[in-house]
C-alpha cells in the first residue's frame, strides 16, 4: 500500500518565495489569468497571478498544468480565491524572479468564488474554514 504524503502546512506568499525548489501550500486572491494554451506535450497550461496580504505587489505567478482544458481552474472573477497544495517554488530569469508550478501529478487546487469568505486558515493543521454567506450548517471536508 502506498504511503500517504502529508501536505505542507499553509504559508503566506512572502514566506513561500524564499523556499526555492520546495513544495508549499498557500492561498491567494486571483489578480490575473492568462489565456490557457496547449503545451508541446499536449498538456494544458494556465498562468495565474495571485496575491495575499503579505505580497500584494507584484503577486506570485503560478503555472497550473493539466491533461485537459476542463481540469484547469475556471476563474469567474478576478477576486476569486484559490488554495494550492504541494506547488513547487522555482526561480527563472537567472534567479532574479520566482514563480510556482502546480503539477498535475502532485499538486492540487481548490477554487472559491469571490463572495465566499475564508474565516480561518489554521497554520498548524493546514485546515481552511470557508463561509459561503448562507446559514447552512458547517460541513466537514476530509481528505483520504
Swiss-Prot record:
Disruption phenotype: No visible phenotype under normal growth conditions.
Predominant subcellular localization, coarse grouping: nucleus
Matching Gene3D superfamilies: Nucleic acid-binding proteins (2.40.50.140)
One example of a Gene Ontology biological process annotation: telomere maintenance
Tissue expr: Expressed at extremely low levels at the limit of detection.
Domain of life per record: Eukaryota
Keywords: Chromosome, DNA-binding, Nucleus, Telomere
Any one GO MF annotation of this record: single-stranded telomeric DNA binding
GO CC annotations, alphabetized: chromosome, telomeric region; nucleus
Subcellular location: Nucleus; Chromosome, Telomere
Classification via SUPFAM superfamilies: Nucleic acid-binding proteins
Pfam families: POT1
Miscellaneous field: POT1C is a highly divergent POT1 gene, which harbors multiple deletions within its gene body, and insertions of transposable elements within its promoter that probably silence permanentely the gene. Therefore, it is probably a non-functional gene.
Function: Binds specifically single-stranded telomeric DNA with weak affinity. Has probably no function in the regulation of telomere length.
Similarity annotation: Belongs to the telombin family.
Protein name stated in the entry: Protection of telomeres protein 1c
UniProt source species: Arabidopsis thaliana (Mouse-ear cress)
Amino acid at each position: 500500500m502506498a504511503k500517504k504524503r502529508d501536505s505542507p502546512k499553509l504559508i503566506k506568499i512572502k514566506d513561500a518565495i524564499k523556499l526555492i525548489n520546495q513544495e508549499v501550500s498557500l492561498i491567494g486572491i486571483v489578480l490575473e489569468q492568462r489565456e490557457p494554451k496547449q503545451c508541446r506535450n499536449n498538456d494544458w497550461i494556465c498562468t495565474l497571478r495571485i496575491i495575499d496580504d503579505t505580497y500584494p505587489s507584484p503577486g506570485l505567478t503560478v503555472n497550473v498544468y493539466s491533461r485537459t482544458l476542463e481540469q484547469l481552474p475556471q476563474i469567474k472573477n478576478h477576486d476569486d480565491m484559490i488554495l494550492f497544495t504541494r506547488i513547487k517554488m522555482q526561480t527563472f530569469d537567472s534567479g532574479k524572479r520566482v514563480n510556482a508550478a502546480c503539477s498535475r501529478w502532485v499538486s492540487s487546487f481548490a477554487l472559491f468564488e469571490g463572495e465566499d469568505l475564508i474565516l480561518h486558515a489554521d497554520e498548524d493543521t493546514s485546515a481552511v474554514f470557508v463561509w459561503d454567506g448562507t446559514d447552512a450548517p458547517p460541513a466537514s471536508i476530509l481528505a483520504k
